[in-house]
Amino acid sequence: MNIYIMDGLNGITDIIDSFRSVIWNVQYYGVNDFELILAGNAKNINRLTVGKLLVREGDFSAGKYENVMIIETRELSFSVDEGWLLTVRGSGLKNILSRRIVWNQTNLTGKVEPIIRQVITDNVIDPVVPERKIDNFIMDAEQGFSDEIQSTESDNQLSGDNIAEWMESICKTYSIGWDVYINNSKYVFKLYRGEDRTFNQSINVPVVFSPEYDNLINSKYTYDITEFKNAGVVAGEGEGSAQAVVSVGNASGLDRFEMYIDGSSVSSNGEIITQQTYLKLLTDFGDSELKATQTLEKVEGEVVANGLYKINRDYYLGDLVQIVNEYNISAETRIVEVIYSEDENGSTLVPTFSDWSDD
């Protein structure tokens, strides 16, 4: 595989056709990252500078560049066996958004997609403070996702949040993927959702990883209740006997697992809202905190990347696929990460599955 060097939005300027190893990690919810190790000669040192962009062979066509990485660190090392080696590491274009925070308080109400687009517009594309604008940054077409912000999203406000971190959190909550790519000399922000390729639908051909198909090398099934809670007390504003307190959960006996929930972040907005409304907000917040402690059930596994199904042909990052292990335990799980690696021993392409609770 060849790797190409880009000069920002100006396109490809050079090619890397020889290296010791590369790891290219592309993520559905999080920020992509990479590591490239190659000869530490003058040519490589001079051309692989911090801020340069890298793109893989096969990830670009007709002015569109995907899975682009930004060089953020360089390390030059020497050993008797290896000689001088240059290691460059960095992250994907998504990490551009880690350079911005939510500057002004933003209320989270309504549909998820318009809220995300508004946050990007207000803090990246058309901010009030002109110095905060990122030039040549645009948004892809709206996808029309119907997801509504849950009333349990803390106090439904953002202020000072790192945008890349917030994007990972909110997209994971609603199973939405996000990306930043280059098209026609513009940085393009997009939201997307993977296809359903499980047994639970009839539109797409199911993609099944199972020992029966010789495409599941190993698997691990986990069912864990160590962090599980299903009842609790939520303490809100006020002190002592004047503190607002509600209880959540109705389990009883040995089936009841309690926790204390600090609801001080849930605001009554200076008593602008009624007491009844505030207690409802506290209850919703408590329910969301309980939800975060639910039973963990997941299947992990290593698949044969070039077996019966091939990534980027039969299934893609973000898709829901079916896993059936040796004990006929079946799970619908999302491809949340694809790690490509290459060295002198060859190349591998390993998908990573989500926990069941994530989807």
Regions found by a protein language model. Name each.
Residues 65-70, 87, 206, 245, ...:
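Well-ordered beta-strand positions in beta-sheet-rich domains
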